[in-house]
């Protein structure tokens, strides 16, 4: 079956122009067929058939896939292919004309994108140069010291390091804002390519373009936006083709692999993508290429980490975070096989009287200090904490499931609460006042740790990146955030729409919607299973959940 692409005139016209310039007389027209009939009457039936085969082959090669709607048709228009010299003569003007037609065909979405860009400009004007979170200082320190972090993998510091010569936190904010816009464009482009009208392709892109929590993460020195961007663009590229070309498979694999070293929750996603592609019946060789490409950044980073700490890992804190996960329910009295050296991590308080899981990582009173003193992320402490957590899950599987389901309940709740337990607070809202960088105690650790000439002062400038609130832009964003955000319940509905589309296509293993939906579901479930709940973790699932719903 040959699909006819009527939704992407820019790509279609550019393909026509390139074919005009390079194909010459490769695709036969009526004149060529007539000449063949005059020279060789016996070939009158053969020449048109050969021309059709050449045309079909050319379409397939240009599409980069087998049987995919990859530009094989041209909107039902006849495709004349004049000689190469004639095509080259008017190429520049025709490129401009074709691009203009393409933009005109998508003007409605262009208006939406313009509003989204303007909104991000308001954020940048209202909070200059960028906003900070407690993790932000560590990312800056890692960027200037070139040492793998034990707590957080260094994929985001690599990004900051690439921008270090420009010494501009405003540029960091601008690039992250651009990533947010491009994610919305990617969702729209894939859905238009798959046949949705402009409004049907625009709706799934709206949460990415206008959700206030997305806007704030884009304006913070945090790894989340880079992680979401890499995963979203990689999956969108894989949904662009039925059979992704080798080049696309390599690029998508590298992006997914790099996302795993930006945030370690992305490590299982490579396996999720591979399984989803195989179920979608993508050529196994192309899936293998994607897998190998995805392993390159992961294995390379693990080797680099090993050169510093003597172990092959992405970080040294997975056991500690899993311990914080089980801290809300673990009771040593219900763990009869607990080793004596692990009992030091028991909390005698009843589960309903315990603090948030974050306290078991960062507080000075965490039981982890009994093992390692002030360094709760030492190799020994992480190993002991991880073993305790595994024993707790094995001994109390029902309690563990209840804890995970409770956090999932926060994910899909209608209202967002401001409490330490649910991981939502002033840090993830636009405020009328922001804490100056110089008043944050963590800064002193950064200044001590970053001893080389590219310290925080050099990266952020003389003001150390101290944020400034500017009116009336900040007031606009404070009012905006009260209305324009994606409620958790609506995210649940979006996931259900994607699931319904997959079930309806069960004979084809869910079709194209399976891949983005599976990755989105994994991003919703993995954080509550391995660490705890935070609203910023949920945002990673939104773009792909919307893409899956659109494809469904």
Question: Where is each model-derived feature located?
Answer:
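Membrane-proximal stem/loop segments at transmembrane-domain junctions that anchor or position
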Residues: 315-462
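Transmembrane signal-anchor helices characteristic of membrane glycosylation enzymes that use polyprenol
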Residues: 104-131, 210, 294-305
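Multi-pass, polyprenyl lipid-linked donor-dependent membrane glycosyltransferases
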Residues: 134, 171-181, 203-238, 246-247, ...
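Membrane-interface alpha helices of multi-pass inner-membrane proteins
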Residues: 117, 205, 249-263, 274, ...
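Transmembrane alpha-helices of multi-pass, membrane-embedded glycan-processing enzymes
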Residues: 160-167, 172-186, 227-230, 487-498, ...
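Start-transfer (signal-anchor) and selected internal transmembrane alpha helices
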Residues: 1-120, 512, 552
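Extracytoplasmic catalytic/substrate-binding loops of multi-pass membrane glycan-assembly enzymes
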Residues: 126-139, 147-167, 314-315, 381, ...
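Membrane-interface transmembrane helices that cradle and orient dolichyl/undecaprenyl
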Residues: 193-195, 234-249, 277, 281
């Amino acid at each position: 079956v040959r699909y006819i692409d009527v939704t992407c005139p820019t790509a279609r016209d550019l393909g026509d122009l390139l074919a005009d310039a390079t194909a010459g007389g490769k695709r036969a027209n009526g004149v060529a067929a007539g000449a063949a009939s005059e020279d060789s009457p016996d070939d009158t039936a053969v020449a048109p058939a050969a021309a059709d085969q050449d045309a079909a082959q050319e379409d397939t090669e240009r599409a980069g896939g087998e049987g995919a709607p990859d530009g094989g048709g041209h909107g039902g228009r006849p495709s004349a292919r004049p000689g190469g010299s004639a095509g080259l003569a008017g190429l520049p003007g025709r490129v401009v004309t074709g691009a203009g037609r393409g933009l005109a065909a998508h003007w409605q979405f262009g208006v939406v994108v313009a509003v989204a860009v303007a909104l991000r400009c308001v954020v940048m004007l209202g909070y200059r140069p960028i906003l900070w979170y407690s993790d932000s200082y560590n990312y800056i320190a890692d960027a200037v010291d070139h040492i793998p972090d034990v707590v957080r993998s260094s994929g985001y510091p690599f990004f900051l390091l690439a921008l270090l010569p420009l010494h501009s936190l405003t540029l960091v904010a601008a690039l992250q804002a651009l990533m947010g816009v491009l994610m919305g464009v990617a969702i729209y482009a894939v859905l238009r390519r798959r046949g949705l009208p402009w409004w049907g392709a625009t709706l799934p892109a709206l949460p990415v373009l206008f959700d206030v929590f997305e806007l704030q993460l884009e304006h913070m020195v945090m790894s989340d936006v880079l992680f979401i961007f890499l995963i979203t663009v990689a999956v969108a590229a894989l949904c662009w083709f039925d059979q992704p070309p080798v080049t696309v498979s390599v690029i998508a694999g590298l992006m997914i692999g790099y996302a795993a070293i930006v945030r370690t929750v992305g490590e299982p996603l490579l396996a999720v993508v591979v399984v989803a592609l195989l179920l979608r019946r993508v050529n196994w060789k192309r899936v293998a290429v994607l897998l190998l490409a995805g392993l390159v950044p992961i294995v390379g980073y693990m080797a680099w980490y090993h050169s510093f700490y003597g172990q092959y890992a992405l970080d040294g804190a997975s056991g500690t975070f899993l311990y914080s996960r089980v801290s809300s329910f673990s009771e040593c009295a219900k763990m009869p096989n607990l080793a004596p050296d692990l009992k030091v991590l028991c909390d005698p308080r009843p589960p309903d009287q315990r603090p948030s899981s974050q306290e078991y990582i960062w507080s000075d009173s965490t039981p982890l200090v009994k093992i390692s003193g002030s360094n709760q992320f030492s190799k020994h402490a992480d190993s002991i904490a991880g073993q305790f957590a595994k024993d707790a899950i094995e001994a109390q599987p029902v309690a563990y499931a209840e804890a995970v389901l409770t956090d999932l309940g926060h994910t899909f709740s209608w209202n967002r609460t401001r409490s330490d337990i649910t991981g939502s607070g002033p840090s993830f809202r636009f405020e009328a006042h922001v804490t100056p960088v110089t008043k944050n105690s963590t800064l002193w650790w950064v200044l001590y740790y970053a001893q080389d000439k590219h310290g925080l002062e050099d990266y952020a400038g003389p003001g150390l990146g101290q944020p400034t609130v500017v009116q009336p832009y900040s007031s606009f964003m404070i009012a905006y955030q009260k209305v324009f955000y994606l409620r958790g319940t609506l995210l649940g509905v979006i996931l259900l729409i994607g699931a319904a589309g997959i079930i309806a296509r069960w004979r084809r293993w869910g079709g194209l919607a399976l891949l983005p939906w599976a990755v989105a579901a994994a991003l919703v479930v993995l954080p509550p299973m391995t660490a705890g709940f935070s609203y910023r973790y949920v945002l990673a699932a939104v773009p792909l959940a919307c893409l899956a719903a659109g494809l469904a």
